[in-house]
Amino acid sequence: MRVSQIMSSPVMTLDKDQPLANAIDLMRRNEISRLVALEAGKIVGMITERDIAREMGSSTTYRLPPGRTHVSNVMTPNPITVAPEVIVKRAAEIMLDHDISGLPVVEGEYLAGIVTKLDFAKVCAEYDDIYVGQVMEASPTTVSPRDRVVHARRVLLDEDLVGLPVMEGGKLVGVVTVRDVAMKLAAFQEAVPNQHKSERIKNLLVGDIMSQPATTTRTDARLPEVSRLMLERRFSTLPVLNLEGELVGLLTKTELTQIARERL
């Protein structure tokens, strides 16, 4: 199987000198997690939700909102690229080895598409012999609705996590993802006057931004149906419940990538 068979196309791009606010708006409206940054039509960088979450929570950004920050200040420069004919297994290896979640697909000078970790859901949709409980990340890190967003952001970034289940009284009440943090902090930055930003952002709670109720799966669910759900709903992570309804794990796009690497 080749990258050209699972990649997404066309690719959303923008100039590296555009305001960061434009990148955030494109991601929000198109429900995508990354954009390719260009200079004179050439690929010079990649900007992701994680980059935005990192930038939006920094003390510098309290003084310099998204409308006054450029994409070039936040993007990862010179992203690794692959050709359309590269085998899918190799693309999975590159992402896992380099701890990245997306690769622009380039044919000569032409940007042909992009392949992301979530695209490996298309591969996993064929593995009817795998159950979620066999491949999930067990005992995931969790947060409370009363935890501060700055704490959840720090955990997501420091531990390189996709999402955090939100627990209250031993029950799953929501999920907070890197996207939730990035988009909500960006909106907050734009709406709150400068003199109040630092204090207001520090007091923003997980319960204010989490996705609720959480869409979940179970340990006995087969991987194909869950892979299709993640792809259709653009879910980067799904909490996994046991047969008693207790949270026991997470299934993320990273697990899908690992499965593709191992099975192809």
Which residues make up each language-model segment?
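Tandem CBS (Bateman) regulatory domains
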Residues: 1-10, 48-78, 92-93, 111, ...
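The conserved cystathionine-beta-synthase
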Residues: 14-31, 38, 81-99, 106, ...
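A glycine-centered beta-loop-beta connector
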Residues: 27, 35-50, 95, 103-118, ...
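Short gly/ser-rich anion-binding loops that grip negatively charged ligand groups
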Residues: 42, 64, 78-81, 85
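Short active-site-adjacent helix-start/loop capping segments
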Residues: 43-46, 55, 83, 90
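N-terminal coiled-coil initiation/transition segments in long coiled-coil scaffolds
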Residues: 44, 68-70, 87
